[in-house]
A protein has these predicted regions:
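A short beta-loop-alpha structural element at the N-terminal edge
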Residues: 1-8, 15
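Conserved GNAT-fold acetyl-CoA-binding loop/helix
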Residues: 10-39
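A short helix-loop-beta-strand connector motif used in the catalytic cores of GNAT acetyltransferases and
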Residues: 34-51, 73, 149-152
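C-terminal "cap" of GNAT-fold acetyltransferases
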Residues: 42, 107-122, 126-160
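Conserved beta-strand in the GNAT
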Residues: 52, 58-66, 73-78
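Conserved acetyl-CoA pyrophosphate-binding loop and the N-cap/start of the following alpha-helix
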Residues: 53, 83, 87-95
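Active-site acidic-Proline motif in GNAT/NAT acetyltransferases
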Residues: 67, 80-82, 86, 115-116
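Conserved acyl-CoA
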Residues: 91-108, 130
Length: 160
């Protein structure tokens, strides 16, 4: 359900509900993180997959894996703040890595993370990801709700 995925992503990243989770962007950005049109487009893309996690029939986690050349790309990683710290994130990440290997024979998984989110970067490092040294500007023109403008995106990668 496109709407449920979009709502979960918003809940995990922005607004008051996000602030209850162990990691979020609420202190950096306001406004929508994504929307139903973007989610629908990603679902329709043959080189994208959403991995979903439910508890008692309720969507509590999702992540996007995409084909990115010879690698996989991991993004839109979201766990309902009420369901965090239960190992669900580790399972979602592992499922995305498995999907990238199985569907596209990906040799590595990459992602970008806001450089100020040190707790999240450390979480990925504990799962075998390393900073590549590549940085890119944060797309502030696509995020008019930036509360500060002193951050960019750093790339992490892991061999599969």
């Amino acid at each position: 359900d496109v709407r449920a995925v979009a709502m979960l992503i918003e809940k995990a990243y922005r607004g008051p509900a996000a602030a209850t989770g162990w990691t979020n962007e609420a202190h950096l950005l306001t406004g929508p993180r994504t929307g139903e049109d973007e989610i629908a487009g990603l679902i329709a893309d043959p080189e994208s997959r959403f991995v979903l996690a439910e508890q008692n029939g309720v969507l509590v986690g999702c992540a996007l894996v995409q084909k990115d050349g010879e690698d996989g790309y991991f993004g839109m990683f979201s766990v309902d703040p009420a369901a965090q710290a239960q190992g669900l994130g580790k399972k979602l990440l592992a499922a995305c890595e498995k999907a990238a290997r199985a569907e596209w024979n990906s040799r590595a998984m990459g992602m970008v993370v806001i450089n100020l989110r040190s707790e999240l970067i450390a979480w990925y490092e504990r799962r075998g990801y390393t900073l590549t040294g590549n940085r890119e500007p944060f797309p502030f023109d696509e995020a008019p709700g930036a509360l500060r403008r002193d951050f960019d995106l750093v790339e992490l990668k892991k061999p599969l």
